[in-house]
Amino acid sequence: MNRDIGKNAERELVSILRGEGFNAVRIPTSNSSPNPLPDIFATKGNTLLSIECKSTWENKVKVKEHQVRKLLDFLSMFTMKGVPLIAIKFKQVHEWRVLVPEKAEDIIVTIDNSIPIEDLFKILEKRIEEKILTP
């Protein structure tokens, strides 16, 4: 992904997250950083999101194992509930979609194996509300 396209996608996603009530920041680092830093991290309630962000005109994106590992390693540094996310802006359908990786491995993200970001927000909001209402 072209650096400017990547930066713009990351900024757009941070704006979307903030619009949904998350505290979100872009971490401008290179993939070569030895630190386990995601492209974006966001918090809401006791939930921490660690996000690898991509943008494409294609119908799929390959995310490398080391990119997934940095999401998981970043979350392991915190005690709050963490959710690793791969967020893809599929430009041909004008839609942000997300996938929650289960382990560090190469992953092909497609429109079919991911969910709309709005669905993720509904799931997370329900989880946050349940934690607030449950003593």
Swiss-Prot record:
Residues annotated as site: Transition state stabilizer: 54
Keyword RNA-binding listed: no
A Gene Ontology molecular function term of the record: metal ion binding
Reaction catalysed by this enzyme: Endonucleolytic cleavage at a junction such as a reciprocal single-stranded crossover between two homologous DNA duplexes (Holliday junction)
Pfam families given in the database record: Hjc (PF01870)
Cofactor remark from the record: Binds 1 Mg(2+) ion per subunit.
Thermal dependence of catalysis: Optimum temperature is 60 degrees Celsius. Could be higher with a more thermally stable substrate.
Keywords: DNA damage, DNA recombination, DNA repair, DNA-binding, Endonuclease, Hydrolase, Magnesium, Metal-binding, Nuclease
Cofactor: Mg(2+)
E.C. code: 3.1.21.10
Residues binding Mg(2+): 10, 39, 52
CDD domains associated with the record: Holliday_junction_resolvase
InterPro entries: Hjc, Hjc_arc, Restrct_endonuc-II-like, tRNA_endonuc-like_dom_sf
Biological processes, Gene Ontology terms: DNA recombination; DNA repair
Keyword DNA repair: yes
Subunit: Homodimer.
NCBIfam families: Hol_resolv_Hjc
Protein function: A structure-specific endonuclease that resolves Holliday junction (HJ) intermediates during genetic recombination. Acts only on 4-way DNA junctions in a sequence non-specific manner; introduces paired nicks in opposing strands 2 bases 3' of the point of strand exchange only on continuous strands of 4-way junction DNA. Cleaves both mobile and immobile junctions.
Note: A second Holliday junction resolving enzyme, Hjc, with different substrate specificity exists in this organism.
Protein name: Crossover junction endodeoxyribonuclease Hje
Species annotation: Saccharolobus solfataricus (strain ATCC 35092 / DSM 1617 / JCM 11322 / P2)
